[in-house]
Structure formats: C-alpha cells, structure tokens
Amino acid sequence: MDSDSLHYSLDLAAANGLTLSSEQRAALQSSLLIVKRNYKFSRVLFWGKILGIKSDYFIAQGVEDDELKNRKSLYSLNCVDWHLLPPATESMIADVALAATGRFTGDPSHEYEHTEIRTEGEGDEATHEEVTVKVIEASRLAAIVSNIDKDVSVVPRGAFIKSPNGKVQTNRSFGGLHPTEAAKLRNYLHFREPVNLRNKSILEMSELNPALDFLDPLSEDILKGSWSLQLDRGGTVCVLRSLLWLGFTFFHVPQTPQHGYIYMGDGLMNLDLPFML
C-alpha cells in the first residue's frame, strides 16, 4: 500500500484484523517520507509486517522509474530506523529453503545452519562430503519477501500500463474496476514477471491488449481455490485473501483508483493448502 495514503489503506484492511497501533502508524507516516527522500524513490510502499518471536519486522519497498523492476526492500524493528535488505538471488532463496525452518526470531543477525552428507560417485569410488549451509535471518527475510511477492502480489487489471519501451508505470487514467468486474478473479493480476503469458498461443495473444494484459491473471493459477474473493462494507470494498500465504490481503475500492495489499503473518507458507482444497 502506498505510504501517501497509509491511514486510509490501513482502515480498509482493518476489517480483516490487519492493523497497527496509533504510535506505529504515526512513526511510519514520518519515517517513510524520510526513506523516500534519502533513497530518492519515486514511491514508497508499506509492504507489511512479519511476526517474530522476540520482535516483529516491518517491511517497506521503494519504487524507482519502473514499477515492476528493481524494487528495493527495507526492514525496521521500530517503524523509525530502516535498513536495506540484500537482493534475493536464486542461490540465496535455495539456501534459505534448505537451512531456515520454523518461525522468525526477530534478530536480523541470527544464523541458521544446516549440515548434510553429500555422496559423489558410486560403489567403491563413492566419496562422502559434509556440507554446511549457513544463512542469517536478514537473508531469510529478503527471500521470504521475494517469494511472497512472486506468489501473491496483486494489482487490478488496468492499474498499470506497459509502455512501448518496456517500462511499467502507474496508469494515471485508471478509475477503478466496475463493481461487476471487481467480483471476477480474472480481473486481478500477479504483479511480477509473467509466467503463463509466454505459453499462450498466437490466437490467444491477439485478443489481449499488450499495454494492459502483460501480467498473469489470478484465474490461471495452477492451484485453484487458493484465493478468497469477497465484497466487504456493503459491497463497496473488494477484498482478496490468499490461502497460500495466510495473512496476505489485497483490497480495491471499485470505481476508484484506490487499491493495495498488505501482509501480516509469520512468513511461513501454508503447505497444507493442497490437502485443504
């Protein structure tokens, strides 16, 4: 959610139990303005909160010229002092998946360690090597934020446009989805690099608007039933909840450009979802 409309956006998400104290709201409102100025971001988004045992991580993201690429993630333990997270590389995500388990501790320097025996060769020529993988919690935090963004970050169709030079920008003429369209899952898109779009046929691509339909719709997710779509406040607010990452909520006010998402949870994927559907 955009930091410029933080209070209004938090009020829309509060119906789902996702809220912050008055002190935290006030601190975020001031500190995110400083982050925007110091890092020279075009926009700053409040991403959410990951719950830890000792303390919680508040997450923000800075946006540069391209809304989709090169987003910078930052974390804070007190809503005032912000620190950049390292970029989440494929090797980092793999190490985190291997070594880090259980809940976050709340200590960015906490070290996770995993040791395994790897065997190379066969028979008498086989050699055994002990391999230890170590990751700190700050790296785990960066990997989890990246994974959640890839899996469930959502925007309404038309909220962003892709220019001929490939840059993704906010669509200033977007006035919101019609209430009828807002109730359909196909009008919400994954805000990440497209995956399923590349597999479409030429005939299917010819029916799409390249300026608007450059992302994957939620209706094409392989895991059907992983989204809960509801209309709250007498049908004036459309709310999407992820059942894969419990604590993720997207909201959109139909016929207005107001939309956003927030995650407040323990940072653990719901691996039981396939058995729950």
Curated annotation (Swiss-Prot):
Checking InterPro entries in the record gives:
Radial_spoke, RSP9
Compartment annotation = Cytoplasm, Cytoskeleton, Cilium axoneme; Cytoplasm, Cytoskeleton, Flagellum axoneme; Cell projection, Kinocilium
For the biological process aspect of GO, one term held by this record is:
motile cilium assembly
For this UniProt record, the keywords arranged alphabetically read as follows: Cell projection, Cilium, Cilium biogenesis/degradation, Cytoplasm, Cytoskeleton, Flagellum
Q: Where is the signal peptide, in residue numbers?
A: none
Gene knockout outcome:
Dysmotile olfactory pit cilia which have a normal beat frequency but an ineffective circular beat pattern. Effect can be rescued by coinjection of mouse Rsph9 mRNA. Embryos with CRISPR-induced rsph9 null mutations exhibit a greatly diminished olfactory and neural ciliary motility, structural defects in neural and pronephric ciliary axonemes and an impaired initiation of startle response to acoustic stimulation.
The record lists the membrane-crossing segments as none
* Annotated Gene Ontology cellular component terms: 9+2 motile cilium; axoneme; cilium; kinocilium; motile cilium; radial spoke head; sperm flagellum
Assembly and interaction partners: Component of axonemal radial spoke complexes.
Stated family: Belongs to the flagellar radial spoke RSP9 family.
Role summary: Functions as part of axonemal radial spoke complexes that play an important part in the motility of sperm and cilia. Required for motility of olfactory and neural cilia and for the structural integrity of ciliary axonemes in both 9+0 and 9+2 motile cilia. Essential for both the radial spoke head assembly and the central pair microtubule stability in ependymal motile cilia.
Q: Which PANTHER family match?
A: MITOCHONDRIAL RIBOSOMAL PROTEIN S18, RADIAL SPOKE HEAD PROTEIN 9 HOMOLOG
Record protein name field: Radial spoke head protein 9 homolog
